[in-house]
A protein has these predicted regions:
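Helix-turn-helix
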Residues: 7, 11, 15-49, 53
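Hydrophobic alpha-helical connector segments
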Residues: 53, 67-78
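Short, basic, alpha-helical segments at the C-terminal edge of helix-turn-helix-like DNA-binding modules
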Residues: 56-63
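Positions in alpha-helical segments
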Residues: 36-38, 64-67
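N-terminal intrinsically disordered/low-complexity leader segments
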Residues: 1-3
C-alpha cells in the first residue's frame, strides 16, 4: 500500500484519538505531513472515507488481538 496513504491514515487516527473526529480537518493532516490538501483528497475524497478506513483498521487490529481468545476456555478468557 502507498506510504503517503498509510501516513494519512496514521495521522488521521492520531487526531481522532487526541482531538476527536469533528475537531480536525484535512489541513491538519496536510500540515503534519507537509503535503497539500489535494493529496489527501486523492486518496480520500471525503473525510468520511478517511473515517471509515480508520475505523476498519482499528476493528481489524482489535480482531487480530482478540481472535486467540476463542480457543481459550471460559476461565482463561477472563
Amino acid at each position: 500500500m502507498n506510504d503517503t496513504r498509510n501516513e494519512i491514515i496514521r495521522i488521521g487516527n492520531e487526531l481522532v484519538r487526541s482531538v476527536g473526529y469533528n475537531a480536525f480537518s484535512y489541513a491538519d493532516i496536510a500540515k503534519a505531513l507537509n503535503i497539500k490538501n489535494a493529496a489527501i483528497h486523492y486518496y480520500f475524497p471525503s473525510k468520511s472515507d478517511l473515517g471509515v478506513e480508520i475505523i476498519e483498521r482499528n476493528i481489524k487490529a482489535f480482531n487480530e488481538l482478540t481472535n486467540h481468545w476463542k480457543s481459550l476456555n471460559y476461565k482463561e478468557q477472563y
